[in-house]
Amino acid sequence: MQKTLKKNFTLSGITLHSGEISNIKVNPAPANTGILFKRTDLKVPHIETLLNAKIENVVFSELCTKLSNEYGHSVSTIEHVMSAFHGLGIDNAIVEIDKAELPILDGSSLEYVSEIERAGIKNLQAKRKIVNITRPIIFRDNDSYIKVTPANNMSINYTIVYDHKLINEQNFIFDLDSTYNYRNIISNSRTFGFKDEVEYLRDKGLIAGGSLENAIVLDNDGIMNQSVLRHDDEFVRHKVLDFIGDIYLLGHRVKGSFEIFKGGHRLTHELVKSIMSDKSNWNYDYDKSDLDDLTFSTLDHKKELSASL
């Protein structure tokens, strides 16, 4: 069955790139809404404030995932909340936001997970569609690549390589088969960066809100944070966290076996585009836990969505 929240929740915090305080309100949504972002700060017609979290709305942005609608309005750094939605099985939600960027919080998805669980999750009377990969697909960029092959569930095999003694080469294998696994194995892994890149990125107008409170920062000696790593392989686990958020831009959960080598946001976006570009790459399946053939009528769905917005 499709799922949403039982009630709304709010969060506030500094944004990673613009350095502003951003306030969000995450609301339940009716079946077949998907994940929808709504800019509450814009003084424009209502329809122009909405951004659907699907690959066709993704635009290029360094170091994060950014959506833009046909009216030129955007919202960025959505990957962590998208990861939490995917990891906890939330199919439908409306995220109201009063800035163009989501708060970075502690650099992981843990706070989103905690708030979703506190709000509660409820079933909706509609079957959950799943994107089922039907043939191998690969996207390469120099020595980086990402590929997917057909499978009965969603599995991730992720490898990162960095010239730093705390990272070197890290590999992590993860099956997105339970909310417990996502919460306890992935959700608290923080974003990371390198001290010698900070000045360069800030000169480009990025990471204005970055600090040791919301990212792991590495110098030549190790990590600069007073806190210790949450996992020895926290770096690659965070990459898995980002991937779980970005692959959800398919608009549905997915069945496929993913192998990623030296990946990132853009590589995942390109794979999603490749998947959706040819209907022979995939078909729709249904969650096997859905025993009843229950759907909202189009009219009921439109009425509920209108009321939610």
Regions found by a protein language model. Name each.
Residues M1-D91, E96-L309:
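C-terminal regulatory domains involved in ligand/effector binding and gene-expression control
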